[in-house]
Structure formats: C-alpha cells, structure tokens
Amino acid sequence: MTQTLQVKSRINDYPIIFTDDIFQPLNQFLAEKGDVKLLFITDQTVFDLYQPLFRRFQQDYDSYLHIAAPGGQSKSLEEVSRIYDRLIRANFSKKDVIVTVGGGVIGDLGGFVAATFYRGISYIQIPTTLLSQVDSSIGGKVGVHFKGLTNMIGSIYPPNQIIVSAKFLDTLSEREFACGISEMIKIGFIHDRKLFQQLLVFPKDRNQEQLRQMIFQAICHKKRVVEKDEFEGNLRMSLNFGHTLGHAIEALCHHELYRHGEAIAIGMVFEAKLAVQQQLLSQQDLEALQAAFEAYQLPTTLEAKSMTAEALMTVLKTDKKNSGQHIVLILPTTKGYISFPIAKHDNHLLDWLRSLLDIA
C-alpha cells in the first residue's frame, strides 16, 4: 500500500511517499526526467544490507555508486570534494539525479552536493533510519560539519522526492531506533502531547502498526512546520529544542561518543531544566520528559567527565541560531516553546552550565 503527502515549498514542492515497496515509487519521477544518470550515495552498512535495491536500478538506469566514509566524519568538505570528482568523471549534467540511501548523515551530505553541483541538481532521499525518516530528510536542510562545528556549512535545498519505508527499520539496532524516537519525543513534547503520551507507553508492546501511525503523525507535524516556516524565521525554530546544547555536546565529543539522537536527548533535558528554573515548565513535565528518554535507554546526563562548562560555552558562542551578542536557546513551556536569548557574556549562563555538569 502506498500513501503520499505533498510538501509545499517556496523552492519546489515535493512528495513524501510511504510504501512497503522500495523499488517502484522512484520510477514515475525518473520516467519524467527521461534518460538520466543516477549517482547513489550511501555507506557500507546500508550498501551491504540493500544490494538488491542498487542492482535493481543498475538494470534500468545508467547508475553510479559512491560509498561515503562511515559515521559523522563523512559530513565534511573533503567527502563533498570526493563526490564532486565522481560526478565530474562520470560526466554528470544538470539534468542528472543524486539518490541518497541512508541515515541523516548521508541525506545531509548528498543534499549538500546536489545543492551546490552546477548550482543545483535534482536529488531523491531514501531515508533508512527512523531519525532521518521523521526529521532530517524533511524540510530541505542540507550541510556538512566544518572544523568540528556541527552543520556549519549548508543550505536549504528540498529534495524532489522522499521515499519512506518502514521495512528499513527492521534492520536498525536498538540504539539507532532509540535515536529516532528521541526526535519524535521532541516533536511530541513541543507540538503534540497526545503523541508524546503514546511514545511513553509504546516500549511496553512495540506494536508495529502503532509505530507506523506514530511515524506518520511525526512526519505530518514536521511537514506542517516547514511549510509554514521553511527558512526558520520563527515556528521552525521550535524543532531546535535540545539542539543548541546537543550540537555543542556532539562537537566536543567529535561526533563519536554520542550519536545525534542521544546528544539531543541530553540537550533537551538540560534545556528543560533551565525552563523549570525560569518557571516556564513544571517539574512534572520535566520528569515526564526524562521518563520518556529513559524508557528507550536514551541518556539524560553527560558521561564525558572531561567536558567543562567553559568548553561548552565556547562552542555555544558559534551556534548558527545565535543573534548578535546572544546565545539563543529554544526552551519548552507548558503550552509550547519560546526563544530564550542569553547574553554571551552573562555569567549566569556559565554558572548554569556548571550546575548541569555537577548534576550529571
């Protein structure tokens, strides 16, 4: 069974196709493109698991393959340069297509290449992790890390098509599954407390049909937000809850100790604690948020004992959401969220970071 959501964009509208058949939905878009070349960008793990998918398109299209370096290290200008070389050697033109098959790292990397090669070529996202299905593949954010700073170089460049299949989730580790749940908890806590409550009880039975419904709900919320605020003027900032601190934690751990969903979980708990201190959020809500993460064995405290408040502060000062001399945090409230600016030289922020590290 196939279901389609159409996402409106000021750049180009695009469909999100939900299907159990990962081989067919691409054909309509590619048929309209005519005789095109395809460059598949993936990683070794996904390639080994889904070789039939790649072979299927090799039969019908002039297709090429780029296997990126493992983990977050592939979100780099060096990897981008290697892909440019691959495209040039294969004589790709502006009408040809990039297809990303993988998690958020692969989607961000391939999308950035598509956005910048010939000033923009078509690309298709096939997200294979829960996190990339409900979050990173939707909305057109693409980019790479630079000198240890998360997503420092990037753009907003929507895909031409997204293929979402729950079948990919069958091969996810528990840890990767939990990382995707982390982003769903964020969406539920800020935008849909009913979804949040469903996520609280879901680990007890793991009903697959319920999981599909929750994925669809989370995607619908992300779709609604990016349609209303594609370029992150206000509403889309709500999706950055946990990400200011989370990205700083990722950077200081060199994207190795914590995966994205784990760092964001810690960031959400830390930022929710500040919201409680500011009387924006109840202690009961904070405890419910912590309980949700703990239900999926997601971390809520820092294990990196060598991390200091001063080091966190240094990275926070480079965050792309900052405004002038203010570090901007997205804090949850009882009924939603607020943008909370703190002066970069405010000693209270440093004291708060120290207190969080002591609690951890």
From Swiss-Prot:
What's a Gene Ontology MF term here?
nucleotide binding
Enzyme Commission number, as recorded: 4.2.3.4
The enzyme's first-digit EC class, named in words, is lyase
Specify where it is mainly localized: cytoplasm
- Sequence positions that bind NAD(+): 104-108, 128-129, 141, 168-171
Q: Which residues bind Zn(2+)?
A: 183, 243, 260
Q: Which UniProt keywords apply?
A: Amino-acid biosynthesis, Aromatic amino acid biosynthesis, Cobalt, Cytoplasm, Lyase, Metal-binding, NAD, Nucleotide-binding, Zinc
Give the pathway listed in the UniProt entry for this protein: Metabolic intermediate biosynthesis; chorismate biosynthesis; chorismate from D-erythrose 4-phosphate and phosphoenolpyruvate: step 2/7
**Cell location:** Cytoplasm
User: Which sequence ranges form a coiled-coil region, renumbered to this chain?
Assistant: none
Protein's GO biological process: amino acid biosynthetic process; aromatic amino acid family biosynthetic process; chorismate biosynthetic process
Instruction: Tell whether Transcription is among the UniProt keywords.
Output: no
Q: Which cofactors does this gene product need?
A: Co(2+); Zn(2+); NAD(+)
Cellular component per GO, a single term: cytoplasm
Q: Which reaction does it catalyse?
A: 7-phospho-2-dehydro-3-deoxy-D-arabino-heptonate = 3-dehydroquinate + phosphate
Q: How is the cofactor bound?
A: Binds 1 divalent metal cation per subunit. Can use either Co(2+) or Zn(2+).
What InterPro entries does this protein map onto? Answer: Dehydroquinate_synthase, DHQ_synth_AroB, DHQ_synth_fam, DHQS/DOIS_N, DHQS_C
Decide whether keyword NAD is in the record: yes
Listed Pfam families: DHQ_synthase (PF01761), DHQS_C (PF24621)
Per its database record, what is this protein's job? Answer: Catalyzes the conversion of 3-deoxy-D-arabino-heptulosonate 7-phosphate (DAHP) to dehydroquinate (DHQ).
Per the record, the similarity remark reads: Belongs to the sugar phosphate cyclases superfamily. Dehydroquinate synthase family.
Protein name per UniProt:
3-dehydroquinate synthase
Gene that produces this protein: aroB
